């Protein structure tokens, strides 16, 4: 029951973050498209009330509807990697591969040594050892 509630809360949180990102992307695209929309106005003697309505209307219209055109615009807004530009630290970290281990089971090889230090048989009953009599114990 608790797992279901936590999963539902996590999904709600992630969807809220996604909608916030979409709204911010829509606002950014409105700001970038604003000079083009000013050229579409019929005349320069527009009163300030009409300009405010013109700016607020696209933000309200773009939030509920998502069309393929908007996705293409968002993809075009993303910066394209420049050939001469150095990759960022995250990209370098992604591209780096771990060096191959010295042996195939390099971590497993350490376990029997640790087990023997504490008197634990690593393989259980596969390799039974005779009980050693210790007269001082």
UniProtKB/Swiss-Prot annotation:
Localization: Secreted
Regions of compositional bias (Low complexity) in chain numbering: 75-85
Chain spans, region Disordered: 14-113
Listed GO CC annotations: extracellular region
Signal as UniProt keyword: yes
Keyword terms: Secreted, Signal
Signal peptide location: 1-18
Compositional bias annotation for Basic and acidic residues: 99-110
Family annotation (Pfam families): Pro-rich
Function: Unknown, male-specific function.
The protein, known as: SMR2 protein
Lineage per the UniProt record: Eukaryota, Metazoa, Chordata, Craniata, Vertebrata
